[in-house]
């Protein structure tokens, strides 16, 4: 009876919980802090989506950083174009202000209705404008209102709306002026026509093998230019890393590679950044590709559009995806901060109680 028998099974802590493959993809919503499983999952994700190598000559840029850069460039170009439009409109209004006669100008000034804005506008502009502003009743304005009937006025407004829609569609066909980055797609032409990032230009990696003129004039313009960078990308960093290494060896210092390529873009920004349909290798993991192709029907492949700017809908989608990612990353940190703040009062009260007891025990000097 010298040997003591333990209560229960000694191997109970080593027993593993059986996992159900049906719910294996579901993650817990409870943040339990850092753990070895999370660390291993992060390493597996890095190995799956990224191809890091030692002593890389080129620099990397994250997909989220690139999305923020796109939003900034779009906002700055929009403000710049709106400023140019206002100056052009003011110049046009100043040129058309000669339509009003001097007597009408003096009568408006004496009646107290004249203002810098009203003085520069002509009666024709008041008639053609769609805004609900009051018209200046002059002989020329009444004559113009008689000449142009209601039907003619509506037709003119519809023509103006069509012109605005054509201008908005034509604006997407032009790249941003003074864009700080040059985005290059180093895949072949067929892959580029299927799917690419909006504003990217096709530069196949085979161009680097040329002995004469391997770089386009745009690449030479952005090469080591102050305040400008060149960004390369592909599907999974296989081609882009080789192209970036070759270009860095040839003297490019402002070269970046988009980390993850289209594979990470399809996961983080499925809509907004790209045009066309993603390749199958970007949507389905390579291990599950065959089984998934057998089960799920093939979606129709949509070719990429020839647009060089992001529309307002694209920018809204990019902002929504960024906000969702920021919210998902900020919630665990907020929970940790709340737990820390809840612990602070208890520690402070204990410190106060200790200081009060020590002050009572020690004599006052």
Swiss-Prot record:
Q: Which cysteines are joined by disulfide bonds?
A: none
Task: Extract the SMART domains matched here.
Answer: RHOD
Q: Matching Gene3D superfamilies, A to Z?
A: Rhodanese-like domain (3.40.250.10)
Q: Where is this region: Disordered?
A: 327-365
The role this protein plays is: Required during ciliogenesis for tubulin glutamylation in cilium. Probably acts by participating in the transport of tubulin polyglutamylases between the basal body and the cilium.
Q: Which residues form the signal peptide?
A: none
**Which keywords accompany this UniProt record?**
Cell projection, Ciliopathy, Cilium, Cilium biogenesis/degradation, Cytoplasm, Cytoskeleton, Protein transport, Transport
Compositional bias ranges of the Low complexity kind: 342-365
What are the subcellular locations of this protein? Answer: Cytoplasm, Cytoskeleton, Microtubule organizing center, Centrosome; Cell projection, Cilium; Cytoplasm, Cytoskeleton, Cilium basal body
Protein name per the record: Centrosomal protein of 41 kDa
The gene behind this protein is: cep41
Q: Which family does it belong to?
A: Belongs to the CEP41 family.
One GO cellular component assignment for this chain's record is:
centriole
Start and end of every Rhodanese domain? Answer: 177-274
According to its UniProt entry, one GO biological process term is: cilium assembly
Chief subcellular location equals cytoplasm
Domain of life of the source: Eukaryota
The source organism is: Xenopus tropicalis
